[in-house]
Amino acid sequence: MFRGAQAINLDTKGRIAIPTRYRPELLAENQGQLICTVDIRQPCLLLYPLKEWEIIEQKLCQLANFDPAQRSVQRVMSGYATECELDSAGRILLSAPLRQRAKLEKTIMLVGQLNKFEIWSETEWQAQIERDLELGLSGELATSDALKMLSL
């Protein structure tokens, strides 16, 4: 499981170093294979261990090609999906189209989301966290049935 948010430098070749604490799990369970794609709702990237991506891929295959909204989700998620492999230094290369889509610059945020990571520009991450906290304080989150059942 991937938890926490960490600032990481993006090198001039477009690589990021995956934090050391995650590498053993990624190597043991996925041989260092990851898939990076865009988030269709947020200005960030989604980084999946290969086994997790294969679950998503099956769900994408089940969407209806003749439904425009479902086809759009398939097109974007699959079209941007890029294989990434941990190198010997624990780095992955983020393709130029992915970096441009998420507006990634020198410092990025790698955010654990339990079964995957989100990759944000530092600026976008700070703005999103502020919006999320404001939403929580406003009480609007309590309108979700799933969240009403969540006990923390």
Swiss-Prot record:
A GO biological process held by the record: negative regulation of DNA-templated transcription initiation
GO cellular component: cytoplasm; nucleoid
Record key words, sorted: Cytoplasm, DNA-binding, Repeat, Transcription, Transcription regulation
Subcellular location field: Cytoplasm, Nucleoid
InterPro entries according to UniProt: MraZ, MraZ_C, MraZ_dom, MraZ_N, MraZ_sf, SpoVT-AbrB_dom, SpoVT-AbrB_sf
Alphabetized CDD domains for the sequence: MraZ_C, MraZ_N
PROSITE patterns attached to this UniProt entry: SPOVT_ABRB
Subunit (UniProt): Forms oligomers.
NCBIfam families found in the cross-reference section: division/cell wall cluster transcriptional repressor MraZ
Family affiliation: Belongs to the MraZ family.
Protein name as catalogued: Transcriptional regulator MraZ
Species: Mannheimia succiniciproducens (strain KCTC 0769BP / MBEL55E)
